[in-house]
């Protein structure tokens, strides 16, 4: 065990985690030159295209150090995006060390700080690595100073490397061997293994990625999952080098996989403890906190006949993504669909894209909303995640909205516009600190303002330089109202949103105007109205298309023309009573993108 080192790589998006992982794998001979490809550990097409890591991946490497010993290094690559921060905390709980990768030309950014604090909380040895030192803009000294100022980690021995050119990779490995402590654990104690991740494989069933803390596991052993008491025969154990390689056993301190013919992913919950049925451990390992979805949206198939297919697709996605939650719901406007819970907007975007890509679904998505706490007059508190389910205003004592604490890092040139943006979004400034050229702003912001379009706005006012990290703080009472949209006098439940009273009227006008341009003209007038309760705050009318019924009258008596016009008017009136208006998918998206910064 003295020769095992478990470490993960943490960094902000685009600071070069995955490239560094590639270099380390290549250097240790995990893959030959022919098999090597960029971002080996990002196995999803989507991860490659967007250049982000979504699922944590592992690789077991052999490294012959300068002291002549051969070390087993278990590398875990983690995501950097704020939506997937729970993936990071899971990966860190399996490690004794973490490489904190900082781009030498960019310095410290928001997720660097967040992930680093997660590591420090879990008592993981943090090893700073300054990457991209081959760039002309690299400034390792100021990056070093920022690490010490902002995070408070000693960076005097930070390793300088360039993952792209392979410069300094050996120094990184030597530092890992020297500074990361070997795992503690007792190979003779009863088996305890923590499930870090689990996913579904079509051939072998559920694959569990585990960190063995105590004991030894061999194929043919009967394993017991401590959360639900289920037992399974273990078929195969092994490690990823990133390819899966079977091993005769997994022992204390190692990170590897277990295949035990488990059919449903819900059985192998992440954070559960695996032990032996014959000789179980007395108590499970401390798991992870259950993650709660922050953002909800309705997903509906465009063709109602595809409802079952959507349900199957969501079930399959859930096999790989335990944080996705969904339940069936019915909308008068869109028919049958699902209310899905996501970790954040990026997560929602990715789930939607995977459904469209991997399962060929055509989807309509409603506006994302957050969970509100509604206090009724009776004193009862209910949670509302769908604006259409908000109780009648007369029964409500108060509505509380979720508040998040956002940490924003940005160059000081952009402080003005970013503060203006935060104030527009009803933010309250908590703190502001200067670190060299960088500024750290801390704001309390209402979550529903962030869900709408805060992230895109932040990027545009700071020219892409600002980075954001946020965490949930509390529920706070606010003056919120439900804004309904009526098309042709009918409420369209899927277009309802909960907004702050101060911006309700403005928003109602904006949405109505936007819908007017998107709903195609009909043969009759269509009124689009925004309403708060029974109070109409805005109205737009889509004018009817009409045929010129007088075209065939040449001269002749006026009464003949009047008769034709009256007949047309009657027809339009009748159409208006029975006609219904189809609302295109763009209209649902337009409600999200009502631009408040005009």
From Swiss-Prot:
GO molecular function annotation: GTP binding; GTPase activity; guanosine tetraphosphate binding; ribosome binding; translation elongation factor activity
Subcellular location: Cell inner membrane
Catalyzed reactions per annotation: GTP + H2O = GDP + phosphate + H(+)
GO cellular component: plasma membrane
EC top class, as a word: hydrolase
Keyword ATP-binding listed: no
Origin superkingdom: Bacteria
Domain tr-type G: 2-184
EC numbers: 3.6.5.n1
Sorted UniProt keywords: Cell inner membrane, Cell membrane, GTP-binding, Hydrolase, Membrane, Nucleotide-binding, Protein biosynthesis
GO terms for biological process, alphabetical: positive regulation of translation
Gene3D superfamilies given in the database record: 3.30.70.240, Elongation factor 4, C-terminal domain, Elongation Factor G (Translational Gtpase), domain 3, P-loop containing nucleotide triphosphate hydrolases, Translation factors
Keyword Calcium among UniProt keywords: no
Major localisation: membrane
Family: Belongs to the TRAFAC class translation factor GTPase superfamily. Classic translation factor GTPase family. LepA subfamily.
UniProt xrefs under HAMAP family: LepA (MF_00071)
The protein's name: Elongation factor 4
């Amino acid at each position: 065990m003295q020769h095992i080192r478990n470490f993960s790589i943490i960094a902000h998006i685009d600071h070069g985690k995955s490239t560094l992982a590639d270099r380390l794998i290549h250097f240790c001979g995990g893959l030959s030159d022919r098999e090597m490809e960029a971002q080996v550990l990002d196995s999803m097409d989507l991860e490659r295209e967007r250049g982000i890591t979504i699922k944590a991946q592992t690789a077991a490497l052999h490294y012959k150090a300068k002291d002549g010993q051969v070390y087993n290094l278990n590398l875990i690559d983690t995501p950097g995006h704020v939506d997937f921060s729970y993936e990071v905390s899971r990966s860190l709980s399996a490690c004794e060390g973490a490489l904190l990768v900082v781009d030498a030309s960019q310095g410290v950014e928001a997720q660097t700080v967040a992930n680093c604090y997660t590591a420090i909380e879990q008592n993981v040895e943090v090893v700073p690595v300054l990457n991209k030192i081959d760039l002309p803009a690299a400034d390792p000294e100021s990056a070093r100073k920022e690490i010490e100022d902002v995070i408070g980690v000693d960076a005097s021995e930070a390793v300088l490397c360039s993952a792209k050119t392979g410069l300094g990779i050996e120094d990184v490995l030597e530092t890992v061997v020297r500074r990361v402590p070997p795992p503690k654990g007792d190979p003779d104690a009863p088996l305890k293994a923590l499930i870090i991740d689990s996913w579904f494989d079509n051939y072998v069933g559920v694959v569990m990625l585990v960190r063995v803390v105590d004991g030894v596991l061999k194929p043919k052993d009967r394993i017991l999952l401590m959360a639900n008491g289920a037992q399974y025969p273990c078929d195969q154990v092994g490690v990823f080098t990133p390819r899966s390689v079977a091993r005769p056993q997994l022992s204390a301190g190692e990170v590897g996989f277990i295949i035990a013919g488990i059919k449903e992913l819900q059985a192998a919950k992440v954070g559960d403890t695996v032990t032996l049925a014959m000789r179980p451990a007395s108590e499970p390992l401390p798991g992870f906190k259950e993650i709660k979805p922050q953002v909800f949206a309705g997903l509906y198939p465009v063709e109602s006949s595809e409802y079952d297919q959507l349900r199957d697709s969501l079930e399959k996605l859930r096999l790989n993504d335990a944080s996705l939650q969904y339940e069936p719901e019915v909308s008068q406007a869109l028919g049958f669909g699902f209310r899905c819970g996501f970790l954040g907007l990026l997560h929602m975007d990715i789930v939607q894209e995977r459904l469209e890509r991997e399962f060929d679904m055509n989807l309509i998505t409603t506006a994302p909303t957050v969970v509100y706490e509604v206090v009724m007059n009776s004193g009862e508190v209910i949670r509302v995640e769908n604006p259409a389910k908000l109780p009648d205003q007369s029964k409500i004592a108060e509505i509380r909205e979720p508040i998040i604490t956002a940490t924003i890092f940005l160059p000081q040139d952009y402080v003005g516009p970013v503060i203006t943006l935060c104030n527009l979004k009803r933010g309250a400034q908590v703190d502001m600190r200067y670190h060299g050229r960088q500024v750290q702003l801390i704001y309390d912001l209402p979550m529903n303002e962030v869900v709408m379009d805060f992230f895109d706005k932040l990027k545009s006012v700071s020219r892409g330089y600002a980075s954001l990290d946020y965490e949930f703080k509390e529920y706070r009472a606010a003056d919120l109202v439900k804004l309904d949209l009526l098309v042709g006098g009918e409420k369209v439940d899927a277009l309802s949103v909960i907004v702050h009273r101060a911006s309700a009227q403005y928003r109602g006008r904006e949405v109505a105007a936007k819908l007017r341009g998107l709903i195609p003209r009909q043969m009759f007038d269509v009124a689009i109205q925004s309403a708060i309760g029974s109070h109409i705050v805005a109205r737009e009318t889509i004018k009817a298309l009409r045929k010129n019924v007088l075209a065939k009258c040449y001269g002749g008596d006026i009464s003949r023309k009047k008769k034709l016009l009256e007949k047309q008017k009657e027809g339009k009136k009748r159409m208006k009573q029975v006609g219904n208006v189809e609302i295109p998918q763009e209209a649902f998206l337009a409600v999200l993108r009502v631009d408040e910064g005009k």
